[in-house]
């Protein structure tokens, strides 16, 4: 399986997925910490990939996503963005609304 295939599978298999530095319990950068805090505030479970333990994904995901930085939040197969977008969406209520909409979609 190529790295692009692995990334695609991770995104398909997880409704809410964040590619981050570190883990939700121990983020390794301030941006990842803020992004995880925003997601946690929304109250739904999410999956994560620690790019520090996956150097192949760390090097290839920016090409796959056409997004150069981390963290990267993916919801329902769509790239939402990085830390600043996540925080902006949290502040204006869009993040929770999107997460609830996607969760409802898969509860049938």
Curated annotation (Swiss-Prot):
Glutaredoxin domain location: 4-106
Function noted in UniProt: Monothiol glutaredoxin involved in the biogenesis of iron-sulfur clusters.
What is its quaternary makeup? Homodimer.
Q: What keywords were assigned to this record? A: 2Fe-2S, Cytoplasm, Iron, Iron-sulfur, Metal-binding, Redox-active center
Pfam families recorded for this chain?
Answer: Glutaredoxin (PF00462)
Q: Subcellular location, in the record's words?
A: Cytoplasm
> What's the main place this protein lives?
cytoplasm
Recorded GO cellular component terms are: cytoplasm
Which amino acid positions bind glutathione, per UniProt?
21, 58, 70, 83-84
SUPFAM superfamilies in the record: Thioredoxin-like (SSF52833)
- Record keyword Oxidoreductase present: no
The UniProt GO MF terms for this protein read:
2 iron, 2 sulfur cluster binding; disulfide oxidoreductase activity; metal ion binding
Q: Transmembrane residues, as ranges?
A: none
What is this protein identified as?
Glutaredoxin 4
Q: Which family does it belong to?
A: Belongs to the glutaredoxin family. Monothiol subfamily.
Binding positions ([2Fe-2S] cluster): 29
């Amino acid at each position: 399986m190529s790295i692009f295939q692995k990334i695609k599978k991770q995104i398909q298999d997880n409704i809410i997925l964040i590619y981050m530095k570190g883990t939700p319990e121990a983020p390794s950068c301030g941006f990842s910490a803020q992004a995880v805090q925003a997601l946690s505030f929304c109250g739904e479970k999410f999956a994560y990939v620690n790019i520090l333990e996956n150097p192949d994904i760390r090097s290839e995901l920016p090409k796959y996503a056409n997004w150069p930085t981390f963290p990267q939040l993916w919801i329902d197969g769509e790239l939402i963005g990085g830390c600043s977008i996540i925080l902006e969406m949290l502040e204006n209520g869009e993040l929770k609304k999107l997460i609830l909409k996607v969760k409802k979609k898969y509860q049938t």
